[in-house]
């Protein structure tokens, strides 16, 4: 006699259907569609956990650049001067300073700003 794995099969299918419970229509009712939906959602979640890090770093840089341009400095020059001055502050903290405590960011800008004493060469 053939053995039907009813309990095991039902439990396995219910697990997939429970994971797809927030979906719409057939995607939450049909086992096959639910399984495909959950697998694709897992792929997107995996990808987006990595993208999230990139997007936040871009946001911090964007905010910082906007605050720095108001002070007459660009982001790239600012980061270069920070590295030369051996000041180690990450972009997240700098972004928060730019938004919540601009006076402290101005203090950092003033410490790294140097008067430009470049010799001018006269063309003859």
UniProtKB/Swiss-Prot annotation:
GO terms for molecular function: rRNA binding; structural constituent of ribosome. The keyword rRNA-binding applies. GO terms for biological process: ribosomal large subunit assembly; translation. Keywords: Ribonucleoprotein, Ribosomal protein, RNA-binding, rRNA-binding. GO terms for cellular component: cytosolic large ribosomal subunit. Pfam families: Ribosomal_L20 (PF00453). InterPro entries: Ribosomal_bL20, RIBOSOMAL_L20_CS, Ribosomal_protein_bL20_C. Belongs to the bacterial ribosomal protein bL20 family. NCBIfam families: rplT_bact (TIGR01032). Binds directly to 23S ribosomal RNA and is necessary for the in vitro assembly process of the 50S ribosomal subunit. It is not involved in the protein synthesizing functions of that subunit. This is Large ribosomal subunit protein bL20. It comes from Mycoplasma genitalium (strain ATCC 33530 / DSM 19775 / NCTC 10195 / G37). The gene is rplT.
């Amino acid at each position: 006699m053939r053995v039907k794995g009813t309990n095991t099969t039902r439990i396995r299918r219910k697990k997939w259907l429970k994971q797809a419970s927030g979906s719409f229509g057939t995607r939450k009712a049909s086992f096959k569609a639910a399984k495909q939906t959950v697998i694709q959602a897992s792929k997107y979640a995996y990808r987006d956990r990595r993208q999230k890090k990139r997007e936040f770093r871009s946001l911090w840089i964007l905010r910082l650049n906007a605050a720095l341009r108001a002070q007459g400095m660009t982001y790239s020059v600012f980061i270069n001067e920070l590295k030369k001055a051996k000041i180690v502050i990450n972009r997240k903290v700098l972004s928060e300073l730019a938004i919540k405590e601009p006076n402290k960011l101005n203090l950092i800008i003033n410490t790294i700003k140097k008067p430009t004493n470049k010799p001018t060469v006269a063309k003859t």
